[in-house]
């Protein structure tokens, strides 16, 4: 198979690197320790670097074209058992191919940018489509032409280029300089995906999606707000809106049915199950300031979560069902024990208050809370 033939194959295939531990050096093409692919010291494409040997990493066609463009046209390509073997002189590359339906993806893009949506700022489109654009499900779009042309993957960070919003900017008359590339970290992508999963019952509704200078903002039914900028993501949980979700009136609340409350908290718990499964609590400590957790994660490092603040590197805070249940078991002796809510305080935080102020479950809505 020649280069010209390969170009006919790749656009209809989703290509993935089969192993994450790519440490070998093949001729002039180097797969480095951090999974950065270079050719003649020029960085061509970056892949996520995981410890799981069986992890498959997605690569888009634009990146492949850059790599293949450096190879001789007489390079040989062989496909055996879904593995793509490339040889060019002393260079050898082995990849695994996965098929996907290109036409269905094009149809989705057409539906997103259909004139019937009447693009405006903010504008609406289907929630599922929105999450496809902003989560890891975006991978196949990398094989398409404009406006979804190229993406840079580095470790757990997904860099989405401005060209992704070309159609939006054109209709909104936004200059390229006004919007910088967005960074959606693994945590933020998880928050988006888990939010969608938690609210799956409402998937027929649309969400508000707004480009505000350097920020990409999502509004989930005026209950949960997710803002992703070029530096960090913030998730806001307005207590008053959550109370509406709980069908609660007033700030002093009595939950006659604790099981029902746990069910609601579990629905809006955004931490992935993998996080809970790999986190082993060493011990718990209760004091006048509230509940303090000391946890040990799978890597052996100790992680302190004080007063139930869920601190994540990119600034996202979330409910966690397991912690919430511990509070209920510790402080609620019966189903009629009151739970107070404190709306946005001077720091912009909101909280559930248990046991006459003995414990606070804090939900942060400000960047300052991270410092």
Predicted segments, located by residue:
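Structural preference for solvent-exposed beta-strand-turn elements
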Residues: 1-371
């Amino acid at each position: 198979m020649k280069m010209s033939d390969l170009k006919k194959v790749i656009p209809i295939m989703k290509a993935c690197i089969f192993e994450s531990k790519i440490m070998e050096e093949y001729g002039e093409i180097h797969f480095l320790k951090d999974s950065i692919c270079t050719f003649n010291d020029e960085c061509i494409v970056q892949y996520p670097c995981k410890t799981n040997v069986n992890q498959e990493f997605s690569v888009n066609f634009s990146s492949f074209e850059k790599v293949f463009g450096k190879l001789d046209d007489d390079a040989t390509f062989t496909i055996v058992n879904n593995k793509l073997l490339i040889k060019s002189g002393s260079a050898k590359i082995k990849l695994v191919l996965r098929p996907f339906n290109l036409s269905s993806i094009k149809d989705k893009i057409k539906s997103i940018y259909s004139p019937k949506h009447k693009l405006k700022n903010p504008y609406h489109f289907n929630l599922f489509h929105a999450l496809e654009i902003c989560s890891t499900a975006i991978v196949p779009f990398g094989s398409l032409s404009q406006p979804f042309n190229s993406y840079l993957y580095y470790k757990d960070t997904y860099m989405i280029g401005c060209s992704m919003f070309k159609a939006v900017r054109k209709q909104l008359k936004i200059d390229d300089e006004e919007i910088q590339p967005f960074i959606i970290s693994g945590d933020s992508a998880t928050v988006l995906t888990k939010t969608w999963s938690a609210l799956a019952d409402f998937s027929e509704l649309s969400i508000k999606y707004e480009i505000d200078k350097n920020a990409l903002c999502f509004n989930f039914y005026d209950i949960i707000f997710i803002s992703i900028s070029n530096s960090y993501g913030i998730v806001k949980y307005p207590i008053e809106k959550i109370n509406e979700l709980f069908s609660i009136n007033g700030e002093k609340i009595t939950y006659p049915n604790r099981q029902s409350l746990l069910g609601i908290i579990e629905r809006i718990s955004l931490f992935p199950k993998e996080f809970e499964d790999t986190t082993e609590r060493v011990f718990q400590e209760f004091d006048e300031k509230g509940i303090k957790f000391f946890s040990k994660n799978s890597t052996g490092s100790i992680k302190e979560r004080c007063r139930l603040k869920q601190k994540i590197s990119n600034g996202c805070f979330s409910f966690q069902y397991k912690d919430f249940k511990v509070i209920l078991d510790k402080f609620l002796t019966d189903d009629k024990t009151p739970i107070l809510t404190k709306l946005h305080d001077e720091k912009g935080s909101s909280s559930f208050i248990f046991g006459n102020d003995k414990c606070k479950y804090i939900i942060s809505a400000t960047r300052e809370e991270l410092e």
